[in-house]
C-alpha cells in the first residue's frame, strides 16, 4: 500500500505531530487507556523503551496539546487532546495504524529523508 492509502486527516496529523514510530506508540498507548494517569517510567516499562526517551516523547506530546501534563514529581500524564479535531484525528490514526500499519510506518519514515535531502541540497554548489 502507498501513502495515498492513508486518509488525508491522518496524513496531516502525522506531518504535524508525529516524527517517529516511538512517539506514535506512546500516543496510542495513552489513548488506549485515557482514564489512566501515566508516568514516563510506566510508559517506558509498558513499551520497553528507555525512560529518558519516554520522558522526551510525553513532554513533546504535552507541548503539542495532545497529552495533559499535571504537576507533580514525577509528572503524571494522560491522553487529553486540547482540540476535538486532534482527538478525532488520533482515533482515525489508531484505526488506520491497526489496519494499515506498514503504510503508516512508511509514511513516517519517508518524511525525514525528504527533509534531509532538501537540507543537503541547500549546500550544493551551483554553476552561475
Question: Predicted segments — roles?
Answer:
Residues 1-25:
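Short alpha-helical segments that sit at the start of domains
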Residues 16-20, 31-36:
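Short helix-capping/hinge SLiMs at alpha-helix to coil transitions
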Residues 17-20, 71-93:
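Short, cationic-aromatic polyanion-contact patches
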Residues 24-29, 103:
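Pre-recognition alpha-helix immediately N-terminal to the DNA-recognition helix
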Residues 26, 39-46:
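A short acidic, leucine-rich amphipathic alpha-helix
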Residues 48-63:
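Short amphipathic alpha-helical interaction segments
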Residues 62-74:
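A short, conserved structural fragment
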Residues 99-128:
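Exposed, interaction-prone assembly regions rather than primary DNA-binding/catalytic cores
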Amino acid at each position: 500500500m502507498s501513502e495515498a492509502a492513508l486518509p488525508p486527516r491522518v496524513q496531516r496529523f502525522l506531518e504535524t505531530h508525529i516524527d517517529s514510530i516511538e512517539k506514535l506508540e506512546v500516543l496510542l498507548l495513552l489513548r488506549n487507556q485515557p482514564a489512566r494517569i501515566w508516568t514516563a517510567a510506566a510508559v517506558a516499562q509498558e513499551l520497553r523503551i528507555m525512560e529518558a526517551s519516554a520522558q522526551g516523547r510525553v513532554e513533546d506530546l504535552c507541548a503539542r496539546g495532545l497529552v495533559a501534563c499535571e504537576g507533580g514529581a514525577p509528572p503524571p500524564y494522560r491522553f487529553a487532546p486540547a482540540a476535538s479535531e486532534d482527538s478525532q484525528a488520533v482515533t482515525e490514526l489508531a484505526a488506520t495504524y491497526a489496519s494499515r500499519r506498514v503504510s503508516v510506518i512508511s509514511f513516517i519514515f519517508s518524511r525525514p529523508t525528504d527533509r534531509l535531502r532538501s537540507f543537503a541540497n541547500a549546500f550544493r554548489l551551483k554553476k552561475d
